[in-house]
A protein has these predicted regions:
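Membrane-integrated ABC transporters
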Residues: 1-55, 70, 74-81, 99-103, ...
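Juxtamembrane helix-loop junctions of ABC transporter transmembrane domains
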Residues: 15-23, 46-47, 54-63, 67, ...
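An intracellular "coupling" helix at the cytosolic face of ABC transporter transmembrane type-1 domains
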Residues: 31, 35, 39, 127-128, ...
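Transmembrane helices of ABC transporter permease
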Residues: 36, 40-53, 155-209, 283-297, ...
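Transmembrane helix-loop-helix hairpins at lipid-water interfaces of multipass membrane proteins
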Residues: 41-95, 102, 175-182, 280, ...
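Helix-loop-helix
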Residues: 70-79, 173-187, 263-334, 339-340
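Cytoplasmic coupling helices
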Residues: 101-120, 158-162, 185-226, 240, ...
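ABC-type nucleotide-binding domain
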Residues: 348-349, 355-607
Length: 607
């Protein structure tokens, strides 16, 4: 990370009071996620409606059994009514299974769409985003936040429709039986709704805090349990300290998990107790009407009504809990939408230019660059042309903008002034495929996947044959070493290639780039971290790679750039000098001073 780069923060307003007006819009946005599956959801709706209608029929059949079939001794009618009750139970179960199958499939497809959308968005984000964001934070958004939505998108939405339909159908049936008892049953419903909404808001707030803590813990795990993190922790004797730090992070998560689980639990339990006690209230109310001489309620009607009321209890409580769950899930959706709403600064033009044949001429035309408006300029007025097939070396002190300049060519960053061209075309006008085919990068920090040697090389060219892979490895002078391994090209390289030495990893990276065969090559201090003997072997591989290509070399060791066609010396983001090695030495300026520094390093003071 560059010292003048600001730390990335999520877009403001997602978790503030100012966001109070956002939930309706966010709910509409969530509903749009289900739009591609509206046909299947319509089938679910039909199944839900059919299930609700069938389920409320059973109490009416029960009433007829108690008020007609049994008192009148009509055994035939009794048999038919009993079979009807059995049939309603079977139909309700079948409808429920089909409903669960379809809704779960739709929910999992929505989860897949969300994960893919977030990953695609992150793939499009500029390099600056990843230099400012902890890897664990990114992983947590995809794993924990989207994973936390699973219950909502797979069952909560369907549960909401199912329970709402069941409640409406049951209330209508209760009104048909006795409107007075129905009014008594529903008197406290507004209070219950108000309580559930308050509990939902409380859980949403705690869920936001919990997900942030989970992201922080994931970042800690990613950093400290990587190969580099383990090596650093053990060699510095800080393993116990890291363990203690993780335990503290985990302890904070424990507190938030308990608070999230218990938020509003007593209030929701009170609702459950009251609703469970309602049958007793109904029996009491029916008894009062009978004792007062008012229109009596038949035993069959009373039993059917209480059966409906008990049937109302489960979907009503579930409906209130679903409301709480949806409020909680809004916090997760907000965190995902933060990523989906990030501005992608580097985009492909509407009508991009595609170069079929790339010569490789690179030109920096009065280029300015800064990471943002608050930081000062990193590059100012860079003006240099690199003819196709020639080499340019960029040297200078640490922080002078060398790597940044090279990253403007493949559009890892975009210029803030001037332009960079490839074969006379502004790189911002080219399609991404042209840039990917045109430019290959070999950097000091070689990245290898935890896969086989062959798979790592094929990342550059998925359809490469074994002969092409071996030829690239030979050119990079790494074939003999690979062939000496027990598994050869099937050898797993380990996380980030830690089963290979630094020089071996560099040569694997060079072989991968050779396989890609780009006309433009960027060497970003590719040998600066190697010992002299390894550097010589890698340099030979680089020489083979560079032959006939336009090459931009970012150099720390000036001995590697003496043969460059052009050398540019950057100082404070400006091109202080330009020329060949001999020309710059004759000027006895900044380049000559750097050469002298490399040849006569300052003595280290004695302790």
């Amino acid at each position: 990370m560059k010292p003048d780069e600001p730390t990335w923060t999520p877009p403001p307003g997602a978790h503030t009071a100012a966001a109070a007006d956002r939930p309706p819009a966010e709910v509409r946005r969530i509903l749009r996620l289900f739009h591609p599956y509206r046909g299947r959801l319509a089938v679910v709706g039909l199944l839900v409606g059919a299930s609700s209608l069938v389920s409320v029929a059973s109490p009416f059949l029960l009433r007829e059994i108690l008020d007609t079939a049994i008192p009148q001794g009509r055994t035939g009618l009794l048999t038919l009514l009993a079979l009807g009750m059995i049939l309603t139970a079977v139909m309700t179960s079948v409808f429920g299974v089909l409903q669960t199958l379809i809704s779960t499939t739709v929910g999992q497809r929505v989860m897949h769409d969300l994960r893919t959308a977030v990953y695609t968005q992150l793939q499009r984000m500029p390099l600056a985003f990843f230099t400012r964001t902890r890897t664990g934070e990114v992983q947590s958004r995809i794993a924990n936040d989207i994973g936390g939505m699973q219950a909502t998108v797979t069952s909560t939405a369907t549960s909401l429709v199912s329970n709402l339909t069941a409640v409406i159908a049951t209330v209508v049936a209760m009104l048909a039986l006795d409107w007075r008892l129905t009014v008594v049953s529903l008197l406290l419903l507004p209070v219950f709704v108000a309580i559930s909404r308050r509990v939902g808001r409380e859980r949403k707030r705690i869920t936001t805090q919990r997900q942030k803590q989970m992201a922080a813990m994931a970042a800690t795990v990613t950093e400290s349990l990587s190969v580099s993190g383990i090596l650093l922790g053990r060699t510095m004797g800080r393993s116990d300290s890291l363990t203690q730090g993780f335990a503290e992070e985990s302890e904070r998560l424990v507190d938030l998990e308990v608070r999230s689980s218990m938020a509003g639990r007593w209030r929701m339990s009170t609702i459950g107790i009251v609703m469970a006690a309602m049958p007793a209230v109904i029996y009491w109310a029916a008894g009062l009407t009978f004792a007062s001489g008012a229109a009596a309620v038949s035993i069959g009607t009373l039993v059917a009504f209480v059966t409906l009321q008990q049937g109302l209890f489960r979907p009503a409580v579930s409906l209130l809990s679903t409301g709480v769950q949806m409020q909680t899930s809004l916090a997760l959706f907000q965190r995902i939408f933060e990523y989906l709403d990030l501005t992608v600064d580097i985009t492909e033009p509407e009508k991009p230019v595609r170069l079929e044949k790339i010569r490789g001429e690179i030109a920096f035309e009065d280029v300015d660059f800064s990471y943002d408006e608050k930081s000062g300029p990193t590059l100012t007025g860079i003006d240099v042309t690199v003819p196709a097939g020639s080499s340019l070396a960029v040297v200078g002190s640490t922080g002078s903008g060398k790597s940044t300049l090279s990253y403007l060519v493949p559009r890892l960053y975009d210029v803030t002034g001037g332009r960079v061209t490839l074969d006379g075309v502004d790189v911002r006008d080219l399609d991404f495929d042209t840039l990917a085919r045109a430019v290959g990068v070999v950097s000091q920090e070689t990245y290898l996947f935890h896969a086989s040697v062959a798979d790592n090389l094929r990342f550059a060219k998925p359809d490469a044959t074994e002969e092409e892979i071996e030829a690239a490895a030979r050119a990079a002078q790494i074939h003999d070493h690979i062939a000496s391994l027990p598994d050869g090209y099937d050898t797993l390289v380990g996380e980030r290639g830690y089963r290979f030495s630094g020089g071996e990893k560099q040569r694997l990276a060079i072989a991968r780039t050779i396989l890609r065969d780009p006309p433009v090559l960027i060497l970003d201090e590719a040998t600066s971290a190697l010992d002299t003997r390894t550097e010589q072997a890698v340099q030979q591989a680089i020489d083979a790679l560079s032959a006939g290509r336009t090459t931009l070399t970012i150099a720390h060791r000036l001995s590697t750039v003496r043969d460059a066609d052009q050398i540019v010396v950057l100082e404070d983001g400006r091109a202080a000098e330009r020329g060949t090695h001999e020309e710059l030495l004759d000027r006895d300026g900044r380049y000559a001073a750097l050469i002298h520094r490399d040849s006569h390093p300052a003595p280290v003071p004695a302790p």
